[in-house]
């Protein structure tokens, strides 16, 4: 039998793991008195820290200009390609002539929620006929689906 060290034979006992040094237990212990915080000053005090403070130098977020904004009601949608449908059919997760809608895409893990919006794009090649129920679709995707006999229904 081979006497080589194997991953399943290596183990460490809990007592062998190094414990962190206790702070503030008298000046003889090495981390006593000031407990590694130095003498006085703002950083030595408890409960005080200034986020982004760079020692008097102008901070990075005040040096850089303000740019853009984040809209509160941003219209997010998931992108779905016609080539993805062909891959799903080849993997036998969907059958030919089936309806591709939000419930099916959610079940297959393409979208997080049934409430999210879907946009159909024309990346990839579609060789089978499918019916799509999506919120948005590019003109090229509509032509691609129609060329194989399928249809795209835009949900309102």
Curated annotation (Swiss-Prot):
<dbReference type="Pfam" id="PF00828">
    <property type="entry name" value="Ribosomal_L27A"/>
</dbReference>
<dbReference type="InterPro" id="IPR005749">
    <property type="entry name" value="Ribosomal_uL15_bac-type"/>
</dbReference>
<keyword id="KW-0687">Ribonucleoprotein</keyword>
<dbReference type="InterPro" id="IPR030878">
    <property type="entry name" value="Ribosomal_uL15"/>
</dbReference>
<dbReference type="GO" id="GO:0006412">
    <property type="term" value="P:translation"/>
</dbReference>
<feature type="region of interest" description="Disordered">
    <location>
        <begin position="25"/>
        <end position="48"/>
    </location>
</feature>
<keyword id="KW-0699">rRNA-binding</keyword>
<dbReference type="InterPro" id="IPR036227">
    <property type="entry name" value="Ribosomal_uL15/eL18_sf"/>
</dbReference>
<keyword id="KW-0689">Ribosomal protein</keyword>
<comment type="similarity">
    <text>Belongs to the universal ribosomal protein uL15 family.</text>
</comment>
<keyword id="KW-0694">RNA-binding</keyword>
<comment type="subunit">
    <text>Part of the 50S ribosomal subunit.</text>
</comment>
<feature type="compositionally biased region" description="Basic residues">
    <location>
        <begin position="34"/>
        <end position="43"/>
    </location>
</feature>
<dbReference type="GO" id="GO:0019843">
    <property type="term" value="F:rRNA binding"/>
</dbReference>
<dbReference type="InterPro" id="IPR021131">
    <property type="entry name" value="Ribosomal_uL15/eL18"/>
</dbReference>
<dbReference type="GO" id="GO:0022625">
    <property type="term" value="C:cytosolic large ribosomal subunit"/>
</dbReference>
<comment type="function">
    <text>Binds to the 23S rRNA.</text>
</comment>
<dbReference type="GO" id="GO:0003735">
    <property type="term" value="F:structural constituent of ribosome"/>
</dbReference>
<protein>
    <recommendedName>
        <fullName>Large ribosomal subunit protein uL15</fullName>
    </recommendedName>
</protein>
